[in-house]
Amino acid sequence: MAGRTVTRADLCEAVYQQVGLSRTESAQLVEMVLKEIADCLARGETVKLSSFGSFVVREKGERVGRNPKTGEEVPIEPRRVMVFKPSSILKHRINGTVGDGLDED
């Protein structure tokens, strides 16, 4: 069952409620963190957030695909993709199980 979607505004409100910064400062903080993560990923760097997970940029090489309607072979250009690998702590939290408290990442 899918839960609700958490937006930037929700994150800003949570920072405002829990940290005690003003709403403007909370929004700026959230934006700065997201921008830094995006900038690191754009440079091809891995972003590891302890007890949460890692965002990794992977290179996919050129390959041959196939048009499903015609069966014609079509080249697929090389590209970079972003992958999120959750930490074992986050996996245990999502599944409601108790982990050993150690992060595999």
Curated annotation (Swiss-Prot):
GO biological process: DNA recombination; positive regulation of metabolic process; regulation of DNA-templated transcription; regulation of translation
Pfam families referenced in this protein's UniProt entry, alphabetically: Bac_DNA_binding
InterPro entries per record: Hist_DNA-bd, Histone-like_DNA-bd_CS, IHF-like_DNA-bd_dom_sf, IHF_alpha
Keywords, ordered alphabetically: DNA recombination, DNA-binding, Transcription, Transcription regulation, Translation regulation
Coiled-coil positions: none
Repeat in keyword set: no
SUPFAM superfamilies the record matches: IHF-like DNA-binding proteins (SSF47729)
GO molecular function, one term: structural constituent of chromatin
Highest taxon in the source lineage: Bacteria
Record has Repressor as a keyword: no
GO CC terms in record: cytosol
Task performed by this protein: This protein is one of the two subunits of integration host factor, a specific DNA-binding protein that functions in genetic recombination as well as in transcriptional and translational control.
Subunit structure: Heterodimer of an alpha and a beta chain.
Record family assignment: Belongs to the bacterial histone-like protein family.
HAMAP family given in the database record: IHF_alpha
The protein's name: Integration host factor subunit alpha
Annotated organism of origin: Xanthobacter autotrophicus (strain ATCC BAA-1158 / Py2)
Species classification: Bacteria, Pseudomonadati, Pseudomonadota, Alphaproteobacteria, Hyphomicrobiales
Gene name, Swiss-Prot/TrEMBL: ihfA
